[in-house]
Amino acid sequence: MVKVFERSATVLASQGAGVIAPAEVFRGMVARNLLPEDHPRCSVTVARYVRRDGDRAEGRWLGDVDFNLTTVSWADLFHELRRQAPPGAYHNGIEVHGLASDNDAAFVTMKTSEGAHEQFDLIVFADGYRSLGRQIVAPGTNLRYRGLVFWRGLISSAEADIDRLDGAVTRVVYPGGHGAVYLIPAAREAAVPGNRTAMWGYYLPVPADTLSSVLTDTHGRQHHGSVPSGQVRTDVTEAFSERLAELIPPYFLSLIERTAHTSIQAIYSAEVPAYAQGRLCLTGDAGTVFPPFSGSGVLKAIGNATSLHDSLAAAATIGQGLSAWSKQQQATIEALQPVAERIGKNLISEIPDLTSLSAADSYSWLSAIHPGAHITLPGK
């Protein structure tokens, strides 16, 4: 019997925005019957890079990089996957307070916040960047704050002109950071009707000593790593808007100004030496944590889950399956690590002077972010 213990008492469908990943990731989910063939999605064929250029509404175009990505609504994705959970399997508002293995590790006993003790053959931790499972499987792992927050929001086609964003993920670049803006299908249960929704998000520096203030919500509650949509204080949104008004083109600023509710996510990173121990394993951000700008979050989470299924199905024992799977995940992480570092360097920490880039410099910069990709520059 499968049981899912979700520590949040609220429905997680409201805790996300858009999901973007290579098109083959979603095709693979359809092939595994995790998503229906007609699941709402939008196609992205280019990554478009722009910068502020005076009063030009959409800024100056720096170049396009050919892509094959798909975007979906987080709310719809959650509802579809949640729908497939067996009846009675999902339990909201329950935390894991402790674990204990028997001598031969044939099962794990889990203690919940309700005082119950339950035994399982396998426990999969998917509990995010502050994972209890990581503390057990990889004790001493350093969770590092990167000095950035990701401020994001959603705005529907009924609220703003977003059709001009069609087919692209627009990266708005400025000194010390960048933003990403792209279309997703409007959630089926969206409060504001519209065929599509624009998701925007910007990386902004926030010193560690002021992070706790930024993460304190409208009710005075301090959050650990994120402030949910609709709970970001007005003084924080005003400060962020004023900062971006000097950095991004007017059109993209107007999307922010018309967005009713926003959320904040603090950016962390962590690396784990192993993904499994005994009958315990880590998936998603419970394992290695990459910043979202690496583009690996969805790819990593889905890859963790599907490969875990395949490894366990192919192995003679759970232990053998977990051992093979853990090694596979480590190899994948080693391949993704330089990608995350390269993107962070070129889009956060060492962004060149965009006002004086020659065509050759632009090509070199975009090639460093997207090695081997087809790049189109202005005038080409």
What are these regions (language model features)?
Residues 1-8, 124-125, 200, 257-342:
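Conserved mid-domain beta->alpha element of the FAD-binding
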Residues 8-87, 93, 97, 346-347:
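Active-site-adjacent segment of FAD-dependent monooxygenases/related oxidoreductases
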Residues 11-12, 132-133, 289-291:
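Catalytic P-loop NTPase motifs of RecA-like helicase/translocase cores
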Residues 15-16, 32-33, 136-137, 294, ...:
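Short, flexible helix/strand-to-coil boundary loops that buttress conserved ligand/catalytic motifs
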Residues 37-40, 55-56, 246, 250-254, ...:
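C-terminal helical "tail/cap" subdomain of flavin- and related membrane-associated enzymes
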Residues 68, 79-243:
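Conserved FAD-binding catalytic core of PHBH/FMO-like flavoproteins
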Residues 214-277, 281-283:
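Flexible internal linker/loop segments at domain or repeat junctions
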